[in-house]
Each structure stands twice: as C-alpha cells, then as structure tokens.
UniProtKB/Swiss-Prot annotation:
Pathway connected to this protein: tRNA modification; tRNA-queuosine biosynthesis
Reaction catalysed by this enzyme: 7-aminomethyl-7-carbaguanine + 2 NADP(+) = 7-cyano-7-deazaguanine + 2 NADPH + 3 H(+)
Record keyword NADP present: yes
GO-annotated cellular components: cytoplasm
InterPro entries assigned: GTP-CH-I_C/QueF (IPR043133), NADPH_dep_7-cyano-7-deazaG_red (IPR050084), QueF (IPR029500), QueF_type1 (IPR016856)
A molecular function GO annotation: preQ1 synthase activity
Main localization, broad class: cytoplasm
Official protein name in the record: NADPH-dependent 7-cyano-7-deazaguanine reductase
Gene: queF
Location relative to the cell: Cytoplasm
GO biological process, one term: tRNA modification
Length: 124
C-alpha cells in the first residue's frame, strides 16, 4: 500500500485538523474539490462529483490537506449523493461552527441523470 492510500485509509473524520482563525473581519473561504468519488449504494458503480464549500469562519478554519483527505475517504464507500453531501456538511458545521456554511456537490451525469445537491446554513 502506498503512502497516499495509507493516509486516506487511516483518516479519522472526527480528528479533522482545524486551526484558529486569527482574523476578526468577516470573510468567505471558498474551497473546490473536483475529484470526489464514492460508490453507488445500489449498483456499486462509481459516482464522481465536484465539491464546492463556502464558509464564513468564526473562531476556526479547516486545514486544507485534512479536507482533501476527508473527501478522498469516500472513494471506496457505498453512499448516496444525498447522504454524502449531508455527512460532509454536518462534519464541517460541527467542527468549525462557522458563521455561515454552504456546500454544493455537482455529480457527473450517470445514466442520463445529473444531480446537484446544495445545503445552505442561511436556509436551515
């Protein structure tokens, strides 16, 4: 097993690394992760998506390698589009307690179906 595979396999989402936000001003962090993949819980076929995260931090920010490893940890999991989006959103909201959080997952079309899931803290 190569070092990258080991990092992803051993990644514990509950230990996702966060850092103190040293800036008092209101600002938005935008992160795009274009290589999300998981397995369809029904067929086992791979699903691919681009993950868009936007948040206004309060006291914490997420470390970028940690979010990359977390997203990559879905690669061999059988999980629905809806569940993966909500799981990612819930973990980020729990760990960061941001002032605002928006998550969008734009899944590649498969079987003539294109799915986009959006979750917005301003609407919840």
């Amino acid at each position: 097993m190569r070092y990258g595979e080991m990092e992803v396999k051993n990644f514990n989402p509950e230990e996702i690394e966060v850092w103190p936000n040293r800036n008092d001003r209101h600002y938005t962090i935008k992160i795009t992760l274009p290589e999300f993949s998981c397995l369809c819980p029904r067929s086992g076929y791979p699903d691919y998506a681009t993950v868009y995260i936007e948040y206004v931090p309060s006291s914490l920010v997420v470390e970028l390698k940690a979010i990359k490893l977390y997203i990559n940890s879905f690669r061999d999991r059988h999980v629905s589009h809806e569940d993966s989006a909500n799981e990612i959103y819930d973990l980020l909201y729990k760990k960061l307690s941001p002032k605002e959080l928006y998550l969008k997952m734009d899944f590649n079309p498969r079987g003539n179906v294109h799915t986009i899931i959006e979750i917005d803290s301003k609407k919840n």
